[in-house]
């Protein structure tokens, strides 16, 4: 063993590098650990196990420095030594080499691997070597991360294959390489462990991009700044700065890709995908009530306002992601809010909450990153991989992540697969050391002493065994869509008591405090690995193993406009699952967990002269291997097909990849090397050796046992005697056999026995001995002393920590500056790309030649359209468009397009229509305001005048408003008194003047107020004021009042102030004036007749009585007694004569005719106003003003009269009689969408419990799509079926039918279930129709909306009654109703429609049907609906009274006219066909065709069909059946759920208001509405429309009324307000008489909320009239005014669905003859049977699902070979004698069914061939009796006539013919 000594000399124990060379007593883990410690402390961290294995201990410093600073004993030195020996064996023995790395995370495997790779590539330093090295760097960049134990933790298994040509030389030529990645740790992408990093590339791109690049990628924006923003997918911000040069790493990454021949544009695309992944992590989601109306909306009454959806908060980040993915931001948001799963073989769309949307976004991020890694690796392989036929030998470097006790990311699957790989790699090691060549040794008769060791075969078999290993079982359970508990049970059955390495916990456990077993939420299984026992949680493991990529994401990507994204999702790494019936439809997918290629040793062709087993190149490229059979196949289940790769889960794929690795490792002609990497301590402390830590690892890997084995046998080469002697160059003169010659050579060499053994035909020899005998030892000796200047790598001295900067050690760095062969960018690296060019690429903007983000977003929103229809606008539409443009011409298109963000022309047109409608509405409101407010003011302007009585009255009514008159002007002295304290009088004394004329208290100085004719008046002139007290009322104070002296400042007083009165009046007028004294014209005329000089001038009253009588002159200025008359006549005589003439009532014309100078006229006018003014003419009682006054009153009375009529209409009294039992057949339809189980059960149970004959009511539930609503744990279909008791095993075939959708969405598929539902003693037949969608539908399959759910039944009944071809689904519905339930569909006369969240009263159906029977002209009716959740919130409280009044006033009033304009779909019943004639009514052709309108592309049609489909259906009934009535039945009652949030309530009322407007517009032109003039329904409709659009003005008008009443106290406004109050009083009378006392409180709340109902809601509704989801269909204008409908949904061919009954019956017949007849899909029984018997309670033969039939007049031929089935099936009637006595069954659209004698059922089928059916016979009998003479007709005569008409013998049908004839003649039919 001396040859194993180190070159370091003989200094001590540490000088021994070989552990097996140590003495036997040191061959224990403790002693070996001590020996490693002694070497570690002298900088020798390595030790040899044999020539093909060594141990390396991570020093956490330099990996290239050994003892004395040289390579000897260092990790790099040992790695290069192993690489040299592998290369020699590769060249000289043409063997495949495999190097396997074992070690825990942080032990330095990645570094040692890089050293070995560098050393191997140094052997052939070529441009290809550079690319191979670059490929390794790129792989590490994408798959390594920083963990708590190491900065370069590999998180993907690596199988790196170097491909050589060794056929022609012993110096192998590198011709290619192949990267095989195994199972990337995808959970880390979105769940970064605390204190660790994500994959390095994500940090690189964030740090290494330039400013321009950051802006493009969305990193440099203020809200996305890298400095202050925390990136969800990058962990804690401290991880951005952990000593790793991320910026340099990114530049190296880009350079590596360029040198690997990736185009610059593709590198930029890769960076965009990486950026989008980071941005996906930033998306924040919230729940939002989506109030935007879509055509596929469905659900109950509470869903009308909108449904809860999940939306992105940060729309800017969403836009960035969408732009980089090349999709629409809206579609991306929708896709993230939904997720399609496969549950029980059905595709179901789950409506996600914010947490679910976040998980969905994480799935998208993981998918993108996984596909990107696969794409880059596959493209690298395409660049560097050699053709398989050229490959002779390979060197495989195998490095899987180390064993781990727990998952840092929380992923049980990643932990399981990672540890399974570690277990497999360790098992390979054990087999190589202990079991390999065992057979050959035995054949060669060589005995080797056995060595005991820990064998992990149990764990390996338990985990990896094909078929029934743990991973295979997990994969099988995933493919079977089993639950976690079912997986646990399968593991228990497989391993319990059978495999000691795997233990399974109990599936059930007792919870604390409970004695009952419940599901064990902590269930797990335990695996005893070679490195320890690990417990794996079972929770979520099956789903995680599926790694299902939702079909929604794939559907989204299918629409991408990015070629790179399309290539990314188009690669083979994405395994898709297609629909079995439509292979082009991808339902889901998964990213491969195994490499896309296989090892070359497994896949290449056999070369001449070699014995290597290979596969075809085609298999290599695809990388697909035949999958393993599942456990079911071992059980003999031959019905299950062999699993396909696309259906494999992660565990199955990973198992296959491990199998490939294992097989390639064990392949013939493969030599294995092993590198054991150990950690010196657990704390990553440099140069510290923890003996316990190392000893544990030694024990884990069984180093001591391996060393013992090597001491016994260290063989790696087997040489036949001849080859051995050839290498030994034995002297030919030596005599003896080959064996003897070999023995002689061995004796001469003196090799240890553990390194050489002689067999019977050859020699087992160690690699060291082989190299010696082959004289190759010199090629690997002395290499450690090479100085750096002679070819050493200057970067090789970098410590392990250097990998923080470059991920891999310097020796493997593609950026080495070596000038010798060890460098890849040295002188020998010539690949045509200079570093300068690469640097320029990295330093600039890589996106400058690509589209901007805005351009990407715009391209992502584009749609590929196809024309599906061509049409022309109607004349009315053209007129409306013209009006719209006339009203909105001033708004330019570019503003709507850019500012309004409406790129589509039809959306812009709808906005214009909305604006035009709003203009019309606002104009109507303004017109109403003008008529009711402005018009009266214009006709009779407001006068601020007061009569004397009013002045006095105000004083009496309101003390605070104390008014007084001064010279014809009225002032508020009540405000003056407190504001101006009087020092000489008390305030109470002043109040005596309130309501009086106090002009006498204020004497005036005449000369100060009038200039006369000369320009001045003598100051001594006095003129008394003529008061207006003509009624002798004590409200006038004269100048004799004592207080007048305080205001007398005339000329003759001691205190003269001529201007005091003028100044005082100016102040008074500005502050306290309220108006003027008013004199009606008749009063003025009366005063003039009393010899008063009084007249009207310009609407003002002037009095010259005192002036004409003569004034006075103050005595102080006139000395004589005579008065100078000239001083007193200061007024112009012509003016005075005006007041003396005969026509003195109005002298304005005479005044205008006076010839006065302007100065004199102005002077006279001033005198008139100041001295003679009495007041204004009071015109308030004139004819014009009375008209204006009573006009308002008349309008108010008209409006109130309508409400009063509604009140009287609501007064419907009578006894609460219970209707008798009725025998009419009714259907009860319930459309279901995403309601919860409580709502659905309430609706279904209430319908089933209705007090109506159970046999005569059919419960129909239509499920709109396969959707799981938020808060539900099952799809709606499953909830409904569970309520009805249908087993999960029932799975009918989906059948096609026509739906209401765009393009190809018109083709839908559905399933039909039927059976009996038993609840509280009721046994009710039911029919469930679920719309599952075509196979190509991924998101919300089958969902088309509530209107489509109604159309499913309406169209079916329409085709039944009109004898039209049916779709396959409708044929199946017919079969289920007729043959399984046992009722002919034509018998159903009425349909009750209720919503899924509505509960109906028990007597509802009876009351409805009674109304229909009482009035045969009644086509539809509705009942009263109350709120079930009245007290949920204030929003629901304010709706209670409104609901009550809207039914009991509005609908009751409309019911008087027989024209209820809105029959709510939540609770209404319709007449299907006329009672007398059988004519279809509710399902008539006109109604169905109009209601099934698909092209809903205008604002009007969207408001009709998307907002108020129920109201529009009522409109159609009134329009096409105008002779029939619609009524309100107030005694029929139901309860529903009302919106309890403001947003949903607002949206719901928007829908109601807008649909009301548009439906009333449809009704107004109808001329058939009842009665005439103002008593007509048309007038009421017009008033309703008008009141709807002017509601905002109405509330404003009421406010105006209140204000006017408070301020003016006029009689008329008070009366109008009293009338309004009386109206609400009438409403109160209604609920008082009905003892609804609680309505008092609800009414008060409603009145408080009136501004909301009448003002806020209408304004919001009118402006949001175009708030729709416009879908993908639009209208484009073509040539000559033609318009075309285009859509991206494809073109639908209606002929592809309908099918003739003959075809369907023929198919069913063929199917029946080929297999056994099955029972009902739901229960297996026919109706009214409670046991699986073939005879019903009526004695008829049992019906079978395949015995389909229709009436003869429904398309079935009169003569058919399948008539027997028609006869037998027709006997399966729901009622026999009861139906015969029901009456009114005969109809040209359907006949009855009759009992047949027992012998009829026993006749041979051959005798019945070609006979007519019962229905055909019945129809002909009815026709014969209609025209025959009933006095002479006989049964025999009827039979003979039938035989003549049908042309067949009917003896066998005599009994039926006789019974039918009797029934018709007796009136039973």
Curated annotation (Swiss-Prot):
Source organism: Pyricularia grisea (Crabgrass-specific blast fungus)
- GO MF term set: actin binding; ATP binding; chitin synthase activity; cytoskeletal motor activity
One GO BP on record is: chitin biosynthetic process
Q: Which Gene3D superfamilies match?
A: 1.10.10.820, 1.20.58.530, Homeodomain-like, Kinesin motor domain, Myosin VI head, motor domain, U50 subdomain
Compartment(s) where it occurs, according to its Swiss-Prot or TrEMBL record: Cell membrane; Cell septum; Cell tip
Positions bound to ATP: 103-110
Q: Where is this region: Actin-binding?
A: 658-682
This chain is glycosylated at 122, 290, 427, 558, 660, 1029, 1054, 1120, 1448, 1554
Q: What does this protein do?
A: Polymerizes chitin, a structural polymer of the cell wall and septum, by transferring the sugar moiety of UDP-GlcNAc to the non-reducing end of the growing chitin polymer. Involved in mycelial growth.
Quick check: keyword Transferase in the entry?
yes
**UniProt superkingdom:** Eukaryota
> Compositional bias (Polar residues) spans?
583-593
- What gene name is given for the protein in this entry? csm1
As for family, the record states: In the N-terminal section; belongs to the TRAFAC class myosin-kinesin ATPase superfamily. Myosin family. In the C-terminal section; belongs to the chitin synthase family. Class V subfamily.
Region annotation Disordered: where it falls in the sequence? 579-653
Provide the topology term for how it sits in the membrane: Multi-pass membrane protein
Main EC class of this protein?
transferase
Q: What is its main location?
A: membrane
List each copy of the DEK-C domain by range. Answer: 1811-1866
What factors induce this protein? Constantly expressed between 2 and 5 days of mycelial growth.
Name of this chain's protein: Chitin synthase csm1
Write out the transmembrane intervals: 880-900, 919-939, 1191-1211, 1579-1599, 1612-1632, 1639-1659
Is-annotated flag, keyword Ion transport? no
PROSITE patterns noted in UniProt: DEK_C, MYOSIN_MOTOR, SIGMA54_INTERACT_1
Task: Give the record's GO CC terms.
Answer: cell septum; cell tip; myosin complex; plasma membrane
